């Protein structure tokens, strides 16, 4: 099941150097204590955390107001722009593609080209990506590019790791 309001435990998967922007790196040392304290505060999902006051987030282990604002920004990092989804109906050829692309477009930076590459490589849903290794995704997409002589680039390792982390968070497949 796809869930953009991910469990708070997903912070441990999402908050690492492999899949976030450098401006969020300073939050990494806080992730374990944050998750532990947020759960104690009965904050179980991203939306629960978004409702917390700045004071509550300080109590959860963040050191100052700047870190609180950075954490709030991090929580919205993987929110999808609804306008991005409008493209799907224009580019999809059938219901199967449309269903697949609705999930794949949840991944950061994914639009038609990357979604089509993942689709052709057999990664049709976030659950497929969540249980895959970066090496498997890179190898399969590279194979499709070669086989179909596509003028596309293989996804970068960091991009694939980000997609795997987000897919795991959104499907509750929390493998660290």
Show which residues each predicted segment covers.
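C-terminal extensions
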Residues: 1-176
